[in-house]
Amino acid sequence: MSTPAPLQDERRALVVLLSVIFLNIAGFGLVIPLLPFFGKALDAPAWQIAILFSAYSFGQFLGEPFWGRMSDRVGRRPVLMVTIAGGALAYVALAFAPTIWLAFAARFVGGFLSGNISTLQGALADITRPEERASKMGLMGSAFSLGFMIGPAIGGLLAHPELGTLGFQIPLFAAAGFGLASALAVAVFVRESRPEPKSGPRAPQIEVLRQALAHPVIARGMIISFITVAGFAGIEATYGLWTEHRFGWGPREIGFAFMGIGVLGAYCQAILTGRLVRRHGEPKVLTAGLVAMWFGMGFQFLSPTWHVAMIGFAFVCFGQSICFPCLTALISQATPPDRQGETLGINMSNMALARIGGPVFAGQLFSLVNPGAAFVVTAILIMPATALALQILRKAPSAA
C-alpha cells in the first residue's frame, strides 16, 4: 500500500535523477564548442581534433555494458557516484593535458566513465511504476535536451582561446563542477533502487543480435541509425573548424549556435514529433526527417553567409530531432516485450560505434578534401537511408 512518505521519496529521487542527467549533459555539451579550438591550441591537425570526439565515444561504447553489469551487481547508487565523480576528474585532467595524446587519454577515460546512461535509465525505471515509465523517460529526454541547450552556451561564454590552453581551463573546471555537484546529489538524496536480480538463463548476446539483424524493420532501423548518427557526429566534430574557416567564428558564436539549435531540438522532441507521429505514423515522419536532413546538409555546404548556414543547420536539427524518436519507436515496436532492453541496448552500441567513426572520417574529409566535404558525403549517405525508410514504410504494418 502506498504512503505519502514513499511517494515523496519517489518524487525526490526523480527530481534528483533528472537533475543529475541535466548536469551531466550540460557538462558534456559545455565542452563540445571548445574542443576544436582546444585541439588547435595543442597544435593538432583536423584529423586529431576529430579523434578528441571519437575517443570519448569509444570510451562510452566500452563503458556502457561494463557499468550496466556492475550496477546490476553492486547497485545503481555506488556506480553513479563513482562514474560521475570520476568523469568530473577527467575534465580536470583534460584541462591540464600538455599534449594532444594526453588529451586523447583524458577524453577516453571521461567517455568510459560517462557510459552510465543505462544505469541512469535503470535507476529511473526502478523508482517508476510500469504504467508511468514512458512519460518519465520522456522527462529524461527533456533533461538531455535542456542540458545540451545550456551547456554549449556556457562553454562559449567562459572560453578564452586567445590565451591558448589556459583559456579553456575555466570552462573545463565548470564542467567538472557540474559533475561533482551531480555526484554529491546522488550521495545525499538518492537511495539504492536496484531490485533483487532474477535467476535463470538468458539468451546469449550474439543470439539476440542475430535475431535483431534478421528482422526487416529492426535491421533497417539500425542501419539508418548508424548512417544518421555517424553523419551528424562528423558534422558536430568539424563544425567549429568549418565555421571558423568559412565565417571566422570562435567558441562564443558556436556555443550560441548550439544553444539555439538545442532550443529547436527540445521543441521538436517534446511537442512536434508526437503530433506528427499521431497524424502520419513513424515511417512517414522518419522519411520526412531524413529528407529535411538531406536538404539542410546541402544548404549549409552552399551557404554564402552564416545566416543562410544557420537555416540549413535548423533543417538538419529538425530532421534529426524527429528521426531518432521514430527510429527508437519502430525498433521497440518490432521487439518482443522481454527483449526491449537488450535490443535497444544493441542499437545504442550501434550508435556509439557511429559516433566513433563519424568524427574521424569527417576530420579526414576536412583536412584532405574540402572543409565542407562532410556535408556533401553525409547528404549522399542519407539517400540510401531514405530508401530504407521507404522500405520500412511498406514493411512496418506486417513486420512489426
Where are each of the predicted segments found?
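Juxtamembrane intracellular "pre-TM" segments in multi-pass secondary transporters
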Residues: 2-11, 191-223
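Short amphipathic helix-loop junctions that connect adjacent transmembrane helices
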Residues: 33-47, 237-253
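Helix-breaking motifs and short loop linkers at transmembrane-helix boundaries and internal kinks
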Residues: 43, 75, 96-101, 303-304
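Helix-to-loop junctions at the C-terminal end of transmembrane segments
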Residues: 63-75, 268-282, 366
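Structural signature of the two symmetry-related core transmembrane helices
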Residues: 78-93, 284-299
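Cytoplasmic helix-loop-helix junction between adjacent transmembrane helices
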Residues: 105-145
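Helix-loop-helix hairpin linking two adjacent transmembrane segments in secondary transporters
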Residues: 140-187
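C-terminal membrane-cytosol helix-exit motif in multi-pass small-molecule transporters
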Residues: 177-196, 388-393
